[in-house]
């Protein structure tokens, strides 16, 4: 075959491939024609609207207002269907098969988290969910209270140095506290992030969160071939090696310890947990999330170390920044709403009496009913994960012949749902009492932890942690608005953050 013939064959193959892609694209778009399309640039589509993470929420809210809760957004490489419509959300979030898998963006976490619960698909996800659920059992959660307490104590000592200043960025302190908490509860080790924030592990966690966000918002870095040419690619390889090495070393040490302490290695049932730990779960050795995985079984065999590492790393990623953001925004809301703060403090006085320095107990946390309303209202206005996406695994008929094609990426816009004035009148107002009577409201009208089978498995753990840390702050400090007055500049990253910090003013709390 001559060189000319080879070129002709290659050219023909390219034409056939391009033709197939074009026909498939048009067929796909025909199926989606029932969904309102957001007008955009003829070449770049709507991608330029998302140049800054601080624009994302405004842009998506504007789109959905124009299109009544459902719209198609063109991001060049892929169309996204953005949703705040409750009926379609119910279909998506209650699906046990059709919309169970996460969208393609989650692959950016694959090198770090592997097939952990956040990124897992199909059967792996089902098995993992079943294995991990006992780790968030009532009797396990009780033992973590002392961990919340000791790490919150460290944060209070650090915050005391900020008393009297016009403003302090509370987020900086809170996220290191939640990182310490998640490390100790998940792996059973103290990393002392609050007092040693420059450790290799802490730095690697922060950088991996940044790299993942940057890649998700970069048209170039989204493509594997082009991403491999960037500095972040090589940084990611280095940071992932650091993170994996640390987790693996902890797994080896905990496995050795458990083998010497236990002869039985099966998933703990409720009765066994009572027998081993007693009602208070304080008399014997604490069980970290990792210890429970080391005792678990998959098809009758112990979990492989790789499987365990992926799940522990996933909990680390999901469990520190989300909770840190929620606590920080809650403290900001309390500083800006002094009447609400006064009521929250009164509840703390009722629980703790004259001894504000007493260690919090699990029963104390359960008694913090008003503080729970404060947390719910905070998560309504500032949901830690403002949107998340699912992929359809086959063509799905929604209603009246309306088709959601296979491979469609559907973005669940939790921020828009939570701030819908038809569901929550006067949504800008911080009003915890609106959650006193929510029985008649659709479970899909409020999505701080998602909903359905792929909801947040650790939501009770997160709320308990938030209560313990916020309670500790309220018993030690009076929260006031920062000076000059601060308004968070919301940025949709891996979690909802504020590009200009989350600032308050601190004064010593007079308890007597």
What are these regions (language model features)?
Residues 134, 318, 436-466, 490-493:
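Cytochrome P450 heme-thiolate "Cys pocket" and heme-binding signature region
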Residues 47-68, 245, 249, 358-402, ...:
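Conserved cytochrome P450 K-helix E-x-x-R motif and the immediately C-terminal K′/meander segment
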Residues 178, 182, 187, 239-248, ...:
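Central I-helix of cytochrome P450 enzymes
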Residues 2-16, 74-81, 139-150, 160-184, ...:
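Cytochrome P450
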Residues 412-439:
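Conserved cytochrome P450 K-helix/beta-meander segment immediately N-terminal to the heme-binding cysteine loop
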Residues 48, 59, 137-139, 240-327, ...:
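Conserved cytochrome P450 catalytic core segment spanning the I/J/K helices
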């Amino acid at each position: 075959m001559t060189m000319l013939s080879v070129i002709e064959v290659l050219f023909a193959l390219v034409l056939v491939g391009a033709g197939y892609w074009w026909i498939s694209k048009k067929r796909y778009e025909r199926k989606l024609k029932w969904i309102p399309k957001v007008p955009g640039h003829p070449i770049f589509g709507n991608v330029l609207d998302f140049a800054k993470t601080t624009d994302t929420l405004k842009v998506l809210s504007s789109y959905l207002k124009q299109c009544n809760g459902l719209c198609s957004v063109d991001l060049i490489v892929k169309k996204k269907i953005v949703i705040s419509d409750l009926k379609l959300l119910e279909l998506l979030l209650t699906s046990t098969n059709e919309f169970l898998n996460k969208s393609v963006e989650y692959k950016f976490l694959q090198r770090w988290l592997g097939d952990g619960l956040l990124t897992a698909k199909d059967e792996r996800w089902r098995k993992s969910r079943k294995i991990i659920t006992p780790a968030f059992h009532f009797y396990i959660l009780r033992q973590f209270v002392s961990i919340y307490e000791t790490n919150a104590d460290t944060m209070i000592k650090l915050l005391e140095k900020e008393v009297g200043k016009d403003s302090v960025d509370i987020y900086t302190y809170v996220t290191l506290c939640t990182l310490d908490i998640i490390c100790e509860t998940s792996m059973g080790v103290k990393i002392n992030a609050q007092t040693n924030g420059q450790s290799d592990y802490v730095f690697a966690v922060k950088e991996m969160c940044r790299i993942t966000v940057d890649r998700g918002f970069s048209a170039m870095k989204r493509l594997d071939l082009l991403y491999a040419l960037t500095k972040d690619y090589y940084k990611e390889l280095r940071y992932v090696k650091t993170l994996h090495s640390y987790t693996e070393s902890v797994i080896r040490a905990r496995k050795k310890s458990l083998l010497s302490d236990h002869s039985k290695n099966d998933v703990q049932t409720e009765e066994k947990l009572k027998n081993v730990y007693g009602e208070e779960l304080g008399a014997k050795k604490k069980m970290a999330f990792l210890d429970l995985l080391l005792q678990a079984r998959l098809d009758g065999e112990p979990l492989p170390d790789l499987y365990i590492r992926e799940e522990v790393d996933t909990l680390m990623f999901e469990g520190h920044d989300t909770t840190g953001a929620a606590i920080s925004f809650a403290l900001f809301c309390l500083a800006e709403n002094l009447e609400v703060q006064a009521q929250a403090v009164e509840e703390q006085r009722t629980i703790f009496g004259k001894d504000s320095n007493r260690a919090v107990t699990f029963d104390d946390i359960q008694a913090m009913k008003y503080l729970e309303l404060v947390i719910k209202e905070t998560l309504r206005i500032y949901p830690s994960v403002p949107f998340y996406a699912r992929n359809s695994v086959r063509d799905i008929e929604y209603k009246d012949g309306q088709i959601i094609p296979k491979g469609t990426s559907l973005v669940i816009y939790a921020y828009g749902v939570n701030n819908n004035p038809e569901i929550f009148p006067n949504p800008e107002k911080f009003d915890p009492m609106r959650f006193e009577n929510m029985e008649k409201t659709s479970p899909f009208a409020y999505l701080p932890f998602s909903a359905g089978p792929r909801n947040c498995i650790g939501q009770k753990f997160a709320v308990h942690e938030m209560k313990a840390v916020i309670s500790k702050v309220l018993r030690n400090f009076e929260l006031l608005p920062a000076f000059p007055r601060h308004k968070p500049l919301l940025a949709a990253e891996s979690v909802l953050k504020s590009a200009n910090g989350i600032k308050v003013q601190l004064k010593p709390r007079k308890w007597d």
